[in-house]
Amino acid sequence: MVERKASVERNTLETQVKCSINLDGSGKARFDIGVPFLEHMLDQIARHGLIDLDIECKGDTHIDDHHTVEDVGITLGMAFAQAIGDKKGIFRYGHAYVALDEALSRVVIDFSGRPGLQMHVPYTRASVGGFDVDLFQEFFQGFVNHALVTLHIDNLRGHNTHHQIETVFKAFGRALRMAITLDERMAGQMPSTKGCL
């Protein structure tokens, strides 16, 4: 089997991001981003997606976390696009429901080649541990735009904001895991009647 790995480096005047992924990993993760709550959520993607993730970022967090969070999403999306290759043989679609105490979220993903994000998370607080939760919209938009996926995120219930966000990221990891899994019956075939994605 061809290794589905990628290493991407993206440098701007605002951030310098390095991202390495292995889509057929075991969930190992290492982060040096400088935004602890984001690192905690990225760990959920790795663990629940069984994706090895190594991300470093030096960003202008002395201003705020916006550029760092968005650019990590962009770079992760670029790495996914590179590692997934031509998409032959993958399931393509993935979905997951995840509960954490009172919170319940659903994530559906399609490696369609068309970027699209529908994110509906009615946060009950504006921040968690000093982290502006609205920035997760920027993270997922950056990912979607560069991984070229259609992504639907819905928090169905919950009143603890940390739980709301954590269920989203766990469900995202599990949906990714399903979508990128290789289907033996589809070996070498494109998962589309168009013949391309």
UniProtKB/Swiss-Prot annotation:
UniProt GO cellular component terms: cytoplasm
E.C. designation(s): 4.2.1.19
Annotated localization: Cytoplasm
Record-linked InterPro entries: IGPD_sf, ImidazoleglycerolP_deHydtase, ImidazoleglycerP_deHydtase_CS, Ribosomal_Su5_D2-typ_SF
Keywords annotated in UniProt: Amino-acid biosynthesis, Cytoplasm, Histidine biosynthesis, Lyase
Tagged with keyword Amino-acid biosynthesis: yes
SUPFAM superfamilies in UniProt: Ribosomal protein S5 domain 2-like (SSF54211)
Keyword Lyase applies: yes
Catalytic activity: D-erythro-1-(imidazol-4-yl)glycerol 3-phosphate = 3-(imidazol-4-yl)-2-oxopropyl phosphate + H2O
GO term, biological process aspect, one: L-histidine biosynthetic process
Associated pathway: Amino-acid biosynthesis; L-histidine biosynthesis; L-histidine from 5-phospho-alpha-D-ribose 1-diphosphate: step 6/9
GO molecular function: imidazoleglycerol-phosphate dehydratase activity
Gene3D superfamilies: Imidazole glycerol phosphate dehydratase, domain 1 (3.30.230.40)
NCBIfam families: PRK00951.1-1, PRK00951.2-1, PRK00951.2-4
Family label: Belongs to the imidazoleglycerol-phosphate dehydratase family.
Protein's UniProt name: Imidazoleglycerol-phosphate dehydratase
Native organism taxonomy: Bacteria, Pseudomonadati, Pseudomonadota, Gammaproteobacteria, Pseudomonadales
